């Protein structure tokens, strides 16, 4: 069965070829429920209206029969995948040898795990494991099935099973068995609309406990079969409720195409690997491997060709925590040439997924993504988005994020910088619990390799629309990220209208921010979704079109173009058009010391309008630090580092002003690690098409010379142009650079106060007064004091020097 989804701003409907929306509920009720579900993200809609609508639209979701036979009947109501060939057995798909353990660990891991009991950082993980094993979860409340509570049971069972297996601990074995057999399968009593993303915390550790205990003398074959029956029953009921039910399938998996199906598929696929003799194992594994093949492959548009992930680092990492355990278990339990079958019922047929080409039941072999270069490039992307503190960039719907589980891939030969990234995070060092508790996995699956930072600094991801600049990999280094996403890369439920926005950190401080994920109403988009909540240019107070609900994308495309990576200067452009203006935002990173933002604007409107160069400051109100506005300059001071912003335009100097403030309302509200208010300032000017030339000069508080404040001085540039000189020092050697932005009708010569002369036809110039390096954009040549630095250039950007 396939759904054609038609979404509009306030009216979302799903047209099913079969079955139609049940007649028990008026169509309006179902549409209201679907609309109110909003963009499926943090804090799903849970009100009485939703519960009522769900019950009306989906009788199965409201009343589920509780017998095993009834669950099997319900499961068979909807065909998922295809029946296995008559002569097929589970052994044709994966290992059914009965060897234990084989999911999280194999017998070869035992010596490694035991040897790490007193070895940092694993000693702390061992202690965490013992603490989990000592926990005694409360008894479940009759008539409920709480995934959070059963997750506590599952992790306690897993921890005790590891102690029993690794240390021959009989008491731990007895407790693990008790917790394993305690699992109840009354999933029909669960009313959590987020169960699809919470279920990994139950199924994975419980399956590991079952697997490990069977490598000990402390569980009998009959007890293992009883535990398997309960765990398989929970899985079967979960599949019936979330995958087979047409309404829940739509809102959980079809609309989303993101971490929701990835986490759910990883969970039921893991159970299929654990119980290959289960009658539904092949069916479960077909859907699980189909989702890995589709969403993590080229057709699903979730992972872009350069490794960028459409929903950003937060939800990518959230999904990753469940995906990696499944793929690791699949790698050791399924042969590379195993045949699976595509399952199309969770495909979405609207843009950008209307090219999915899914054929129900089509046979395929899965190249495990853990061995696929494109999927592995997501980890380079994630590390490129690493801020100096170690946590990931605030991008799209994001709070504090790290990619927990990436270091495990060193066991498969993954790069040593995956281990470095895990070990050197200043906020969450050696984290094993963010999004999914993988503590036990780290004990056996982190390779003994020497950690080292990546061999690269700046990275550009044009398909994803992300550019990152950094001076190095230390906590005091400079970092900036530019966003310019288009097409499938911006068409995801967690995306924001943030084309051509950027964020900046330096000297141990965040200075210019993305406002994050403030969502006080779970039935609506976050208040921080749209353009005014980002560092963009507003035209008469308006930015890119607002985001829509669900699969009504809104927003507009932006394009990352004309990138250059160099030792002295790096460059990237983000191009976007809205409000009858095309904005080409270029960002130069010079000397690993400062940034220049050069915004070239073309307007279809011949009369002046108000242009606002917006900056979200990590200062003021609830976030500490101070800021000062002084005409066309702005200074931020925080404990360790600060930032000078100096702005001019090709139409004269703008003035920094603050927009009206309303607590916890855009543009001042943020939620990056807790909600609050921050300062916002707009460099404002009225003109037809004022090109902005803005110097971003970070400094270390209290420092002089290299890391102290740079001297940024205005240059008289003539009509239709603006210019700055920037003075600083590197290793005690002083230098001066010139930044110059020109409209097409500007003069071609710039004479500096000290007598140096530049001549160009370029729209933007950044050049060392010494002639050590130069960059031009939108031009053919540049001379300095009559000496040609760049000539006969036909490319959008050209660089002289390293």
Please annotate each region the language model reported.
Residues 2, 23-24, 34:
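Low-complexity, intrinsically disordered or signal/transmembrane-proximal segments
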Residues 14-30, 54-93:
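Ser/Thr-rich, Pro/Gly/Ala-heavy low-complexity intrinsically disordered linkers and tails
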Residues 30-48:
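Bacterial N-terminal signal peptides that target proteins for export
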Residues 83, 87-120:
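N-terminal module-boundary/linker segments of secreted carbohydrate-active enzymes
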Residues 102, 110, 117, 121-376, ...:
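Aromatic-lined, polymer-binding surfaces characteristic
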Residues 318-511, 564, 685-689, 712-716, ...:
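Carbohydrate-active enzyme catalytic cores, enriched for enzymes
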Residues 395-406, 511-530, 535:
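Aromatic/acidic polysaccharide-binding cleft in carbohydrate-active enzymes
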Residues 518, 522-801:
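CBM-like, beta-strand-rich accessory domains located in the C-terminal region of large
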């Amino acid at each position: 069965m396939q759904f054609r989804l038609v979404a509009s701003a306030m009216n979302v409907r799903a047209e099913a070829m079969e079955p139609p929306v049940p007649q028990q509920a008026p169509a309006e009720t179902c549409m209201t429920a679907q609309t109110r579900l909003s963009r499926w993200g943090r804090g799903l809609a849970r009100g009485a209206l939703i519960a009522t609508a769900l019950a009306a639209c989906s009788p199965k979701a409201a009343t589920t029969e509780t017998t095993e036979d009834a669950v099997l009947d319900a499961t068979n109501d909807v065909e998922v995948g295809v029946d296995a060939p008559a002569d097929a057995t589970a052994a044709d798909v994966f290992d059914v040898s009965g060897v234990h353990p084989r999911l999280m660990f194999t017998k070869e891991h035992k010596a490694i795990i035991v040897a790490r009991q007193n070895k940092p950082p694993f000693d702390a993980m061992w202690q965490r494991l013992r603490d989990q094993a000592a926990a005694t979860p409360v008894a479940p409340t009759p008539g409920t099935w709480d995934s959070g509570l059963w997750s506590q049971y599952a992790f306690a069972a897993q921890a005790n099973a590891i102690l029993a297996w690794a240390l021959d601990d009989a008491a731990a074995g007895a407790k693990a068995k008790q917790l394993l057999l305690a699992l109840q399968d009354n999933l029909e009593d669960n009313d959590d609309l987020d169960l699809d993303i919470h279920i990994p915390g139950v199924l994975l550790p419980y399956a590991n406990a079952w697997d490990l205990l069977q490598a000990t003398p402390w569980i009998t074959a009959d007890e293992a079969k009883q535990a398997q029956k309960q765990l398989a029953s929970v899985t079967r009921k979960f599949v019936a409720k979330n995958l087979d039910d047409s309404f829940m399938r739509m809102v959980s998996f079809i609309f989303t195409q993101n971490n929701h199906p990835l986490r759910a598929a990883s969970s039921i696929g893991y159970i299929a690997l654990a119980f290959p003799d289960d009658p539904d194992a092949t069916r479960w594994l077909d859907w699980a491997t189909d989702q890995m093949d589709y969403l993590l492959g080229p057709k699903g548009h979730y992972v872009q060709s350069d490794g960028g992930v459409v929903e950003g680092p937060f939800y990518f990492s959230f999904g990753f925590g469940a995906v990696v355990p499944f793929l690791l278990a699949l790698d050791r339990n399924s042969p590379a040439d195993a045949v699976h079958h595509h399952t199309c019922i969770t495909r979405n047929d609207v843009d950008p997924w209307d090219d999915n080409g899914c054929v129900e039941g089509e046979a395929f072999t899965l190249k495990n993504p853990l061995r696929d270069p494109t999927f592995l490039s997501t980890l380079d992307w994630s590390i490129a988005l690493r801020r100096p503190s170690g946590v990931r960039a605030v991008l799209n719907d994001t709070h504090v994020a790290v990619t927990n589980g990436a270091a495990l891939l060193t066991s498969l030969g993954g790069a040593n910088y995956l281990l470095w990234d895990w070990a050197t995070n200043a906020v969450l060092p050696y984290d094993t619990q963010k999004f999914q508790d993988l503590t036990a996995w780290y004990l056996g699956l982190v390779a003994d390799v020497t950690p080292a930072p990546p061999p690269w600094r700046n990275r550009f991801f044009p398909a994803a629309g992300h550019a990152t600049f950094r001076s190095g990999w230390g906590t005091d280094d400079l970092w900036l990220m530019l966003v310019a996403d288009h097409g499938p890369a911006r068409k995801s439920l967690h995306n924001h209208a943030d084309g051509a926005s950027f964020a900046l950190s330096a000297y141990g401080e965040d200075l210019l921010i993305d406002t994050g994920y403030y969502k006080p109403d779970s039935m609506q988009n976050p208040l921080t979704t749209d353009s005014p909540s980002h560092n963009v240019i507003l035209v008469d107070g308006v930015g890119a079109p607002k985001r829509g609900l669900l699969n009504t994308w809104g927003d507009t495309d932006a394009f990352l173009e004309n990138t250059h990576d160099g030792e002295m200067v790096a460059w990237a452009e983000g191009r976007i058009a809205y409000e009858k203006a095309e904005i080409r935002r270029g960002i130069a990173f010079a000397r690993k010391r400062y940034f220049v933002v050069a915004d070239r604007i073309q307007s279809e409107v011949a009369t002046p309008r108000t242009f606002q160069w917006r900056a979200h400051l990590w200062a003021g109100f609830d976030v500490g630090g101070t800021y000062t506005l002084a005409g066309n300059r702005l200074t931020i001071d925080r404990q360790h580092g600060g930032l000078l912003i100096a702005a001019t335009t090709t139409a004269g100097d703008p003035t920094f002003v603050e927009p009206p403030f309303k607590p916890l309302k855009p543009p001042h509200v943020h939620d990056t690690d807790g909600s609050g208010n921050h300062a916002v300032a707009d460099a404002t000017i009225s003109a037809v098409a004022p090109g902005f030339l803005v110097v971003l000069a970070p400094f270390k508080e209290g420092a002089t010379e290299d890391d102290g404040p740079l001297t940024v001085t205005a240059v008289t540039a003539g009509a239709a142009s603006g210019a700055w000189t920037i003075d600083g020092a590197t290793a005690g050697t002083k230098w001066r650079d010139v930044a110059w932005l020109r409209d097409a009708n500007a003069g071609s010569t710039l004479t500096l106060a000290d007598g140096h002369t530049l001549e160009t036809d370029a729209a933007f110039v950044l050049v060392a007064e010494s002639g050590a390096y130069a960059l031009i954009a939108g031009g053919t040549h540049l001379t300095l004091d009559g000496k040609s630095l760049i000539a006969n250039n036909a490319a959008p950007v050209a660089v002289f020097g390293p």
